[in-house]
Amino acid sequence: MLLCLSPAWLMKVATPGQEGEAVLLVSKAVSFYPGGLTFLDDFVPPRHATYFLAGLGPESGRGKEAAELARNLTCPTGTSSELSQLLENRLLMRWLLSQQSGVAVPATLAFTYRPPGLLRGGDASPGLRLVELSGKEGQETLVKEEVEAFVHSEALGDASQVAVRLSGCRWRGQQALPLHLRVEPSTVVNTVLGLLEKLEEEESVLVEAMCPPVRLPLPGGPAPGPELAVRICAVVCRIQGDRPLLSKVVCGVGRGDRPVRHHYTLPRTLRVALAQCGLEEEAQVALLEQGIKEAAEGALAAVLALEAGLSVEQRGGRQVHTDFLGVDLVLTVIGRTLTPVVLKLNSGLCLEACGALEGLWAVPRLRRSAEEAAAAPLVETMLRRSGRHLMDGKQLLVIGAGGVSKKFVWEAARDYGLTLHLVESDPNHFASQLVQTFIHFDVTEHRRDEENALLLAELVRARNLKLDGCFSFWDDCLVLTALLCRELGLPCSPPAAMCLAKQKSRTQLHLLRCQGPPWPSTSLHAVACCPLENEADVERAIYQVPLPGVMKLEFGSGAVGVQLVKDGPQCREHFSRILHDLQGEADHPGIGLGWGNAMLLMEFVEGTEHDVDLVVFGGRLLAAFVSDNGPTRLPGFTETAACMPTGLAPEQEAQVVQAAFRCCLGCGLLDGVFNVELKMTGAGPRLIEINPRMGGFYLRDWILELYGVDLLLASTMVACGLQPALPAHPRARGYLVGIMCLVSQHLQLLSSPSSRETLQTLHDQGQLRLNLLEEALIPGQYEEPYCNVACAGPSPAEACHRLLGICQGLGIDRPNYPVAHFLSHFK
């Protein structure tokens, strides 16, 4: 991230083929580094901006220059002069917010002269009265009638004063605020008539109620000084999915007989400000916090809805979107209820106030605040939009199309502007119609991957595909992808590392031999195991691996064929059964049988199971997301339930993240998005297996929902040799708890059209999250989950409660499938 202190450090250059648009180049800027280091850098040649946010308010001092720089850029832009003027138009915003549910605004009478088109149409609230003027002179009778009706209306509530002000871009921060007693309408009329003479087109004169400060009983009797008023500043940000999220709230406290303004009061937290005014009762404070959250988020929702209907010219550019908003509120009593009322919107003052409060903890020897910075969600949005901009138009080759659970790949690729070329064995795969180029090629025989990589490279060259990257999200095709990348000179982890991670026994045995340095060595996380290819191997393994153990396919996925074995006879029986039932790809497509049906026996370790999804670039850990798994239905290991984020203690969470990361590095996995399965035992994390690709099932969807980070976008960026810019310490915005549905347990539910319609309806309504993992309802001994049903909540307990209720209502919970037991780990 770069800070430009002068417009002269930036330059716009017209973009060929994109009429009216320009790229933004940075020739000089302040750069920031960990540890508080800053440098003044000169860039030769200039750098291309991938996101631009300018200070456009009157307080910025360089508003005109910044406005011109922000207009019609090809890169994502956080605001523009055009949008800023709309936000600062007090009447327009008040009219907009008055129509938003859950947002209260002061009672307002507006005299408008040739109002803007955005103000025409729609219904305002009873507390907002718009009077259109045909001219600026000869309006005395109309003004007198309207003012007298307004000051006597019930909409003003307990307000004893009204303010009269001009509204329009010219008047931002340039006028005093005259206050008048409500019982003296003649002075209000005279003030309005005097201001009407100054109006130009699309401007207005506002008469608005001054919300009376809350009179709170102070302990020990009345306060010796004047009554106090609280001014609230809320910062709300646009996050993934164009949803508003309240980031932080700070307050100013001042005299109740005059307006409390920015820069004239010291910022403090809401709870401290309320305590100063005598409000400390927890339930009341929590209720008020929720009201502020709803009002602030409702304000941004209204702005985003308005913005969606604007033309490119009205927004100031194709890439302009409002990414954050400052909301000024005041506390008042409406109908005996303490209510936050939105006074105005701004583009920077509230964020500045939050920064001033956060700056308190930067002083040496003072404890630091554990709260997230107010700008953190904004920075996440900047990074996400910047990444999307970098990937727009990139050409990627995808090896293996996967099944219905990977439908999101093709939808997201279109949204991100990616051009995809697909290599797939099935000539009739639905994804063949969703890509730029489809190459039909049999990739199921993985023992010929090296030969196939050479053949595919020739096909790519023959078609003259100009690739920026190549990747796969399908287990079976990972080694082939690495070999092809090496042949084409594209970024990827080495094929040897992919082979090592793909074969489960090789992974464990290799890590067991890694004794360090560095310390702790990866051998501490590996588990004793033995590869099995024939019956003699089974006999040897029984004596080498402590029992009970886990027997599984070397190259398997989805927990198909994985079973707990307690003694020698069970080992022999399960090995023989798998050898007979699962001989090749045709017996169970998509679980790795194209690599053969070799097995392994590994030690069974007690503990809680966890998934760690990592983003690694150049051998550096960029992000990690930990989820918890519920108990499985032994002796099988098919997943039952999951919870995100993890319920592990912070130290244990750090241990599983570091264990997963070190195991990946130990295998040579230096670049990519990886999924690592571990158990947290009494002795620390132990490795189950490494999946050298993006996490499957619901994981990408959940991480995107909770953290705003898209593992698919990160995967494609790494595949193109670009480092994803991800938040260093992402915080989850709630919890998700999910349960798997199996054909063997839920066939009646899943085959019923009405039940499936109910699931889809609940998903569309936001009552649950439905992730379809399989397309066909195929019963069998070796099954994979058909779908995942999840519920969100502010805590694991609340999410579990909602999910259990839905499972009981729909029939997912049953005697042979006790959902409450599967969720018991998450309390």
Swiss-Prot record:
ATP binds at residues 542-611. GO terms for biological process: carnosine biosynthetic process. Mg(2+) 2 binds at E689, N691. GO terms for molecular function: ATP binding; ATP hydrolysis activity; carnosine synthase activity; homocarnosine synthase activity; metal ion binding. It catalyses: beta-alanine + L-histidine + ATP = carnosine + ADP + phosphate + H(+); 4-aminobutanoate + L-histidine + ATP = L-homocarnosine + ADP + phosphate + H(+). Binds 2 magnesium or manganese ions per subunit. Mn(2+) 1 binds at E677, E689. InterPro entries: ATP-grasp (IPR011761), BL00235/CARNS1_N (IPR041472), CARNS1 (IPR031046). Its cofactor is Mg(2+); Mn(2+). SUPFAM superfamilies: Glutathione synthetase ATP-binding domain-like. Keywords: ATP-binding, Ligase, Magnesium, Manganese, Metal-binding, Nucleotide-binding. Its EC number is 6.3.2.11. Homotetramer. Catalyzes the synthesis of carnosine and homocarnosine. Carnosine is synthesized more efficiently than homocarnosine. This is Carnosine synthase 1.
